[in-house]
A protein has these predicted regions:
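Active-site neighborhood of HAD-like aspartate-dependent phosphohydrolases
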Residues: 1-45, 181-182
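A metal-dependent, Asp-based hydrolase signature
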Residues: 49-81
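Short, acidic loop-to-helix structural element flanking the phosphoryl-transfer center
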Residues: 76-109, 149
Length: 208
């Protein structure tokens, strides 16, 4: 293995268990919102479109009126997508020893496509390990997101090491492919087999 001086972790699907851990989790959320199965495809396309805007800094809850009108939904007073999502997330304690191991061989950071204020909600829910991240790259703050080249340029600069010394853990192949194009080392994490993925990472870091 090449030298590792900095490890970037993805947030959802790696450091925490989000809706990717269960193929039915997103469907359950849609049913809870009142989206009928017959509208699934249309709702998914709509959500994918607005999510790109949200991950670049737009407020997800600002889309609720449009969402309600478009899909004939009724949201409770005070409803927040951020709060709802956070309540459906869980700790991924299998990754915690991996983060500790990474901290021993270099610096660590988060590199995440996320929504404004969602990381704060996740912290408040105590879903993260008690660790001091050296760098946090939040797409909603940077205005660019994975797999766009710019976010990897920013992350490389803030890591302060050569690109080939950066190790990146993510659960989406397209994000890893973009990282490899700038010279990073990568690992594809499987959120549906988190314990197994974490064990493989531990073995790699033990020999780093």
């Amino acid at each position: 293995m090449s030298i590792i001086s900095f490890v970037y972790f993805d947030l959802g699907g790696v450091v925490i268990r989000d809706l990717t851990i269960d193929e039915n989790a997103w469907s359950r959320m849609k049913r809870d919102l009142g989206v009928p199965p017959s509208f699934d495809q249309e709702f998914d396309a709509y959500y994918d479109k607005i999510e790109l805007l949200v991950q670049a800094g737009a407020d997800i809850d600002s889309f609720l009126p449009e969402m309600a009108q478009k899909f004939h939904l009724t949201f409770p007073i005070g409803y927040s997508v951020l709060t709802d999502l956070t309540s459906r997330f869980h700790k991924n304690e299998s990754i915690w020893p991996v983060i500790d191991a990474a901290k021993k061989i270099g610096k660590i950071g988060l590199l995440t496509n996320t929504y404004p204020c969602l990381l704060d909600k996740i912290k408040q829910a105590n879903l993260l390990p008690a660790v001091a991240w050296d760098v946090i790259i939040d797409s909603s703050i940077e205005g660019t997101q994975k797999p766009e080249a710019r976010i990897y340029e920013i992350a490389t600069e803030r890591a302060g090491v050569a690109p080939e010394e950066i190790f990146f853990i993510d659960d989406r192949p397209k994000n890893l492919a973009a990282a490899e194009r700038v010279g990073w080392q990568t690992f594809l994490y499987d959120p549906r087999h988190a314990e197994e993925s974490s064990q493989h990472l531990m073995l790699q870091f033990m020999h780093a």
